[in-house]
């Protein structure tokens, strides 16, 4: 039986990786390069369209626990992330082009994979084939209409991406390398601002022209990817407690903490490109250039990619899917990735691993399995398939139901999660 996967993003490639390694015939439908969404540029698989960071690796962090669980389950995304990483303190950041190339090469190395570079418009749900919808949050066109009819409509939210600038256009005489509180390996470039410089920047930011979006609703902005200009609307000091917070950073030229800081993170290993951390925006492009050049050290910044906003689409999973991320009516149709309501690169990839595991069991005529809810991934999947009012969700400590205080959870939860995941893997074998 052939397994058809629609979409070769982070979720789709994890499903494929799990199946291909066991000899299952896989057919991947990927519309790139014939058709690109508004945020996709690279024809390779596993393209990162927002930040190049896969968040923290620390086991005192929910994202770090999720990565550790995925490593137990043999994640292709993490395998390539480690191979293509760039310095980013405690975060796992990657050279996005090398990362996508790595994933693509791994998938195409199998003889039992067929890749069809075409846009899918609908699915014939005949019972002799399995289908996986992993089309991501930018699902659109005729397929989106077909899927909407199948699932009873979509839920939506908006998020934005940050600009990327050329490394050789940064004036390093006005910036300094450091990580907060002196932790890490000083991988971030910090652009310090005085009170006067910040006030000028803030005034220009809130008065800058924005690109209008159809049906835009500020209440539908995803909290992690809010445009910087929307955060600024909350008050003049809102950025000082958000993306421009200076805490934990000392300017070596003054020996003092600056009034505000804008951080830059490497996009590639050689430092040819940097992204502005927390600077997601939907300002008009000439306005982005003008305002970025108000930042000390970036007066001559060359923008390689401008920030943009896009609408993200996901299905109402509790109504549509069972606990295995399978359609409640069509037993040969699975879903994976952000289309299910998870949020984040790692979270999306993790759902693909889970779906791959259960498709293998389906093919072997075994009972499908749910993950223990005392794993980070299991708790996340439980949320998106049972929530009474689904909102996009990323890995966090609140999902895992254990009787611990906040401090104890941060220190000990990883032991419980990883032990449960190892037991799950042993049960599979």
Curated annotation (Swiss-Prot):
<keyword id="KW-0274">FAD</keyword>
<dbReference type="GO" id="GO:0047151">
    <property type="term" value="F:tRNA (uracil(54)-C5)-methyltransferase activity, 5,10-methylenetetrahydrofolate-dependent"/>
</dbReference>
<dbReference type="Pfam" id="PF01134">
    <property type="entry name" value="GIDA"/>
</dbReference>
<dbReference type="InterPro" id="IPR036188">
    <property type="entry name" value="FAD/NAD-bd_sf"/>
</dbReference>
<dbReference type="GO" id="GO:0002098">
    <property type="term" value="P:tRNA wobble uridine modification"/>
</dbReference>
<comment type="similarity">
    <text>Belongs to the MnmG family. TrmFO subfamily.</text>
</comment>
<keyword id="KW-0520">NAD</keyword>
<dbReference type="GO" id="GO:0030488">
    <property type="term" value="P:tRNA methylation"/>
</dbReference>
<dbReference type="InterPro" id="IPR040131">
    <property type="entry name" value="MnmG_N"/>
</dbReference>
<keyword id="KW-0819">tRNA processing</keyword>
<keyword id="KW-0285">Flavoprotein</keyword>
<dbReference type="GO" id="GO:0050660">
    <property type="term" value="F:flavin adenine dinucleotide binding"/>
</dbReference>
<keyword id="KW-0963">Cytoplasm</keyword>
<dbReference type="InterPro" id="IPR002218">
    <property type="entry name" value="MnmG-rel"/>
</dbReference>
<keyword id="KW-0521">NADP</keyword>
<protein>
    <recommendedName>
        <fullName>Methylenetetrahydrofolate--tRNA-(uracil-5-)-methyltransferase TrmFO</fullName>
        <ecNumber>2.1.1.74</ecNumber>
    </recommendedName>
</protein>
<dbReference type="InterPro" id="IPR004417">
    <property type="entry name" value="TrmFO"/>
</dbReference>
<feature type="binding site">
    <location>
        <begin position="7"/>
        <end position="12"/>
    </location>
    <ligand>
        <name>FAD</name>
    </ligand>
</feature>
<comment type="function">
    <text>Catalyzes the folate-dependent formation of 5-methyl-uridine at position 54 (M-5-U54) in all tRNAs.</text>
</comment>
<dbReference type="GO" id="GO:0005829">
    <property type="term" value="C:cytosol"/>
</dbReference>
<keyword id="KW-0489">Methyltransferase</keyword>
<keyword id="KW-0808">Transferase</keyword>
């Amino acid at each position: 039986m052939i397994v058809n996967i629609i979409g070769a993003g982070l979720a789709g490639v994890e499903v494929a990786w799990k199946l291909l390694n066991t000899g299952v015939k896989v057919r991947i439908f990927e519309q790139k390069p014939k058709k690109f969404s508004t945020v996709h540029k690279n024809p390779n698989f596993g393209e990162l369209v927002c930040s190049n960071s896969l968040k923290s690796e620390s086991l005192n962090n929910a994202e770090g626990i999720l990565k550790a669980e995925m490593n137990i389950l043999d994640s292709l995304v993490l395998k390539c992330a480690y191979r293509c990483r760039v310095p980013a303190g405690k975060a796992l950041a990657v050279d996005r082009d090398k990362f996508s190339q790595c994933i693509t090469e791994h998938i195409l190395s199998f003889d039992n994979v067929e890749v069809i570079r075409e846009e899918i418009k609908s699915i014939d749900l005949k019972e002799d084939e399995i289908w996986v919808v992993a089309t991501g949050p930018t699902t659109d066109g005729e397929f989106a209409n077909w899927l909407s009819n199948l699932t009873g409509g979509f839920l939506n939210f908006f998020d934005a991406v940050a600009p990327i600038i050329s490394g050789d256009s940064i004036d390093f005489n006005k910036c300094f390398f450091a990580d907060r509180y002196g932790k890490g390996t000083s991988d971030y470039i910090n652009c310090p601002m005085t009170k006067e410089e910040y006030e000028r920047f803030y005034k220009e930011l809130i008065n800058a022209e924005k690109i209008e979006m159809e049906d835009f609703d500020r209440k539908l902005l995803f909290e992690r990817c809010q445009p910087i200009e929307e955060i600024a609307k909350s008050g003049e000091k809102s950025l000082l407690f958000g993306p421009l917070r200076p805490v934990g950073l000392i300017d070596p030229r003054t020996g003092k903490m600056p009034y505000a800081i804008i951080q830059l993170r490497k996009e590639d290993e050689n430092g040819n490109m940097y992204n502005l951390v927390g600077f997601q925006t939907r300002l008009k492009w000439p306005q982005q250039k003008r305002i970025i050049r108000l930042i000390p050290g970036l007066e001559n910044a060359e923008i390689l990619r401008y920030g943009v906003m896009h609408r993200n689409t996901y299905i109402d999973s509790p109504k549509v899917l069972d606990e295995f991320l399978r359609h409640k009516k069509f037993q040969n149709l699975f879903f994976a990735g952000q289309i299910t309501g998870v949020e984040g690169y790692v979270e999306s990839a993790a759902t693909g691993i889970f779906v791959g595991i259960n498709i293998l069991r389906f093919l072997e005529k075994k009972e499908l399995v749910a993950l223990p809810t005392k794993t980070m991934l299991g708790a996340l999947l439980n949320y998106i398939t049972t929530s009474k009012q689904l909102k996009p969700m990323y890995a966090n400590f609140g999902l895992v139901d254990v009787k611990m205080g906040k401090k104890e959870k941060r220190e000990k939860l990883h032991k419980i999660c990883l032990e449960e995941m190892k037991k799950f893997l042993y049960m599979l074998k």
